[in-house]
Swiss-Prot record:
Gene expressing this chain: lysS
Protein name, UniProt field: Lysine--tRNA ligase
UniProt similarity note: Belongs to the class-II aminoacyl-tRNA synthetase family.
Assembly and interaction partners: Homodimer.
Cofactor binding, note field: Binds 3 Mg(2+) ions per subunit.
Gene source species: Haemophilus influenzae (strain PittEE)
Catalyses which reaction(s): tRNA(Lys) + L-lysine + ATP = L-lysyl-tRNA(Lys) + AMP + diphosphate
Residue positions binding Mg(2+) 1: E413, E420
Biological process according to GO: lysyl-tRNA aminoacylation
Length: 502
């Protein structure tokens, strides 16, 4: 018999015993009572009473009602020490036969298992080791767990099980709970920041007839009632800019985007983005906003501007570096013989790319080739917080051209730890230029570029009504959560990440 078969046999045996206990509870009446009301959380009690002197605490006679899942139990004859866990943390219970009604200790407490959810009433005291504990006087089993906790709750270490059965991961791993608390604080902090700046939160369509706002491959579905193919949105950008045309001059949205592309430690097909748009601002203003926001989040969540990520350390209290895409490519590609002139001539750029082993697509112009060279030689060097600026117009179809050099745009990407965290630019509000760029994207798509943008003629019509000078940015919430929680994979910060079916 294999080790796995032995484990399954043991599991089936333990579940059988637990089901028998549940049957006995059903025979007594309501096996799943729901009238218990707690008046305290574990961590709140620790915060308030951990520093209290034991004798003074005993004299106060503080009575509490708590509930949670049984994580450990240690029987000592006529008494049992139990640790329960609620949403805030853990607390110890002292359950003694003499403190409970007759028969309760033997008949009820004796049949509790790890993983069961209980509610208790009792008074606070300190043990000989000075641990805050509840001396229980009333107990109630609220939910019988039919399956045991993983590995007798010594931890859930199988990474795939952690992702597929996140509920077990959250029960078993304090670090996972901390990660998702941090993620929640990131989202709440972002919302608070933009509302305080006078932005209005809005919601735009998830199902779109034309998927616009980014270069990506969309998911396709079909609307039966309308008998039309639709797409899960890849970005909300074009709808948000329509709202600016309509007079909502500061808008933001925190919501999901979907891209039918690869899965990796940095990519999940369903992910959360912040997008915001500010009229009468440019991309420099947005870079300033971003620095301020990330600094505030670090202080509010971590209590410091220092953010540690793996072996790296970032100081969000310092100004972020700002460098153009071309300058970064020359700076970090110098050891590979790249010079500035290689990036401003199509033939030289193509030859440089091919020398680096880059497969140049037929649909690529100079801008796409230069971007590919940057990604090959420079991107992974952008470790400390860096705003990469002045992207080629060819790869920035929605961004405003730079006044001094129309071949590049007033655009930036934020890189931290060698990863793109955000993307923003001064918006293109020239309707005729936008129409021409959409046509160029259509030509690229017809030439085989699956990620080229669709043409949105209604958006062009909106621009023809007049978009004020505007700047907009998208920030990846998942990647920000990875940073603040020091999580190595995007799956660690998404509660239920996409997984291949077994």
């Amino acid at each position: 018999m294999s080790e796995q078969e032995v484990k399954e046999l043991d599991l089936n045996g333990e579940m059988l015993v637990r089901r028998e206990k549940l049957s006995a509870l059903r025979a007594k009446g309501n096996a799943f009572p729901n009238k218990f009301r707690r008046d305290a959380l574990a961590q709140d009690l620790h915060n308030q009473y951990d520093s209290e002197d034991g004798e003074i605490l005993k004299e106060k006679g503080v009575e509490v009602q708590v509930a949670g899942r049984i994580m450990t139990r240690r029987a000592m004859g006529k008494a049992t020490f139990i640790t329960i866990q609620d949403m805030s943390g853990k607390i110890q219970l002292y359950v003694a036969r003499d403190n409970l009604p007759e028969g309760v200790y033997a008949e009820d407490v004796g049949n509790w298992d790890l993983g069961d959810i209980i509610g208790v009433k009792g008074t606070l005291f300190k043990t000989k080791t000075n641990e805050l504990t509840i001396k229980t006087t009333e107990v109630q089993l609220l939910t019988k767990a039919l399956r045991p906790l993983p590995d007798k709750f010594h931890g859930l270490t199988d990474q795939e099980v952690r992702y597929r059965q996140r509920y077990l991961d959250l029960i078993s791993n304090e670090e996972s709970r901390r990660t998702f608390i941090i993620r929640s604080k990131v989202v709440a902090g972002i919302r608070e920041y933009f509302i305080s700046k006078g932005f209005m939160e809005v919601e735009t369509p998830m199902l779109q007839v034309i998927p616009g706002g980014a270069s990506a491959r969309p998911f396709v579905t079909h609307h039966n009632a309308l008998d039309v193919d639709m797409y899960l949105r890849i970005a909300p950008e074009l709808y948000l800019k329509r709202l600016v045309v309509g007079g909502f001059e500061r808008v933001f949205e925190l919501n999901r985007n979907f891209r039918n592309e690869g899965v990796s430690v940095r990519h999940n097909p369903e992910f959360t983005m912040l997008e915001y748009y500010q009229a009468y601002a440019d991309y420099h203003d947005l870079m300033d906003n971003t620095e301020e926001l990330l600094r505030k989040l670090a202080i509010d969540i971590l209590g410091t501007t220092i953010v540690k990520y793996g072996d790296l350390e970032f100081d969000f209290g310092k100004p972020f570096e700002r460098i153009t895409l071309h300058d970064a490519t020359v700076k970090y590609g110098a050891d590979k013989g790249i010079v500035k002139e290689d990036l401003y001539d199509f033939d030289r750029a193509k030859a440089t790319a091919e020398r680096l082993g880059i497969e140049v697509q037929k649909s690529w112009g100079l801008g796409s080739i230069v971007n590919a060279i940057f990604e090959e030689v420079a991107e992974h060097h952008l470790i400390q917080p860096t705003f990469l600026m002045a992207h080629p117009a060819e790869i920035s179809p929605l961004a405003r051209r730079n006044d001094e050099n129309p071949e590049v745009t007033d655009r930036f990407e934020l890189f931290i730890g060698g990863r793109e965290i955000g993307n923003g630019f001064s918006e293109l509000n020239d309707a005729e230029d936008q129409n021409e760029r959409f046509d160029a994207q259509v030509a690229a798509k017809e030439a085989g570029d699956d990620e080229a943008m669709f043409k949105d003629e209604d958006f062009v019509v909106a621009l023809e009504h007049g978009l004020p000078p505007t700047a907009g940015e998208g920030l990846g919430i998942d990647r920000l959560a990875m940073l603040y929680a020091n999580a190595p994979s995007i799956r660690d910060v998404i509660l239920f990440p996409a997984m291949r079916q077994k």
